[in-house]
A protein has these predicted regions:
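Short, ordered "entry" segments at domain starts
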Residues: 1-136, 155-159, 163-281
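A Trp-anchored, charged/polar loop motif used as the substrate-binding/catalytic surface
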Residues: 142-153, 171
Length: 281
């Protein structure tokens, strides 16, 4: 493939050739193409932990959590990847609690894999370890102190994503109209609690390592995340509170996530698989 080097794997595929020699001297040769599965989050919103350690609020009828693949800044469902869960938990009791809190009148506001509401238990993801691996990925990390942010560009475009590490609580907010002033592309890691309001936009992965995350906004549009929102699993003596309100949207985007996994692949471990093979002789 054009651009491939000994140390630069462009297409992320390895070709292996195996030759077997029989006692009579005849040979059989097989060529296999090995690649890695595409990384995908457990759900658009991942809320791990025992039901006694999590709480959630879904305020209003204007929000949307969707596991339908969506291209960045596109219509819901405009992507081509398979859908994932709208909200994923790590234990069945938490799935029951989230579904009950949501209430039947809001089932249609959480879509994705399966029927509405798209809420179910999924394979556990170590969010804390993922955050650590990203921070330690030997790239330039934008480290910020706990604060309110309203006019920063956290990564200027989909082709120039950043890892943004806020070391404490943060309120990320934005102005009015259709011109968000707090935008970002890449990975946002918040060590404390995260609150977003107004027209905040993020393309990629948002990781919250505190005890609460609130995604809200009003008017003609609310906070929007294209990609995934991952909460750290709370310790047995701690908790995690999730609030989704207003006209906010959290939408799965394999396109936005691929920007991250391509930029920092070492942080995302996936299983190897045979993509294709053929017998050569």
């Amino acid at each position: 493939m054009s651009g491939e080097t000994a140390t630069g794997d462009v297409n992320k595929i390895v070709m292996l050739t195996s030759t077997a020699t029989r006692p009579n001297g005849s040979n059989r040769k097989v060529k296999a193409y090995i690649g890695r599965s595409t990384w995908a989050p457990p759900g658009t919103v991942y809320l791990p932990g025992a039901s006694t350690n999590i709480s959630e609020q879904f305020n209003g009828n204007g929000f949307l959590v969707s596991g339908k693949d969506t291209n960045q800044w596109g219509a819901v469902g405009s992507g081509s990847a398979s859908p994932i869960l709208g909200i994923a938990t790590s234990v069945p009791a938490s799935t029951t609690e989230v579904t009950s809190t949501l209430g039947s009148s809001k089932y249609s506001l959480v879509t994705g894999l399966g029927s509405n509401p798209s809420v179910n238990t999924a394979t556990t993801l170590d969010v804390a370890q993922l955050a650590t691996d990203l921070i330690n990925s030997n790239v330039s990390v934008l480290n910020l102190q706990a604060d309110d942010y309203s006019t920063l560009d956290f990564g200027t475009s989909a082709t120039n994503p950043k890892i943004v590490h806020i070391q404490g609580d943060s309120h990320v907010k934005c102005g009015s109209g259709n011109h968000p002033t707090a935008v970002g592309y890449g990975v946002l890691i918040v060590d404390g609690n995260l609150t977003t309001t107004g027209l905040f936009r993020w393309d990629g992965i948002v990781i919250v390592r505190g005890t609460s995350v609130s995604i809200s906004g009003g008017g003609s549009g609310g906070s929007t995340i294209w990609g995934t929102l991952l909460a750290k699993q709370p310790a047995s003596s701690s908790s995690m509170a999730l609030t989704i309100a207003g006209s906010s949207n959290v939408t799965y985007s394999s396109q936005a996530i691929k920007t991250v996994t391509d930029k920092w692949p070492s942080a995302f471990s996936t299983n190897s698989r045979i993509i294709a093979w053929n017998e050569m002789m």
